[in-house]
């Protein structure tokens, strides 16, 4: 193998190792997108994902969808979020849409399959000039 080929392979490997959107960036963007929100007490994080525009946090709780959704409706109102819409479907899923200073927040709460509890998803937008105070 020539030196040039080895150099190209090393550079390609180094570039491939530095991936944008690593865990640190995901946490930073999720923190920005979900700033001012609250997680239900005793929840466990399932996953977090984020891009430049939005972030999603999936959590699990041992409590029922009814209990968790009522808590969120109270907590959002107490923390200056305006609940715009709440929908429930026949499967027990509850969807809540709220805004705080033009910033949207979507919550989807689903009953766990095969056991008690709730899995909920929080989706927020990374603030821009139009969504900041």
Residue positions per predicted region:
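An acidic-aromatic pocket/loop used at catalytic or ligand-binding sites
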Residues: 17-133
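Sec-dependent bacterial lipoprotein signal peptides
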Residues: 1-15
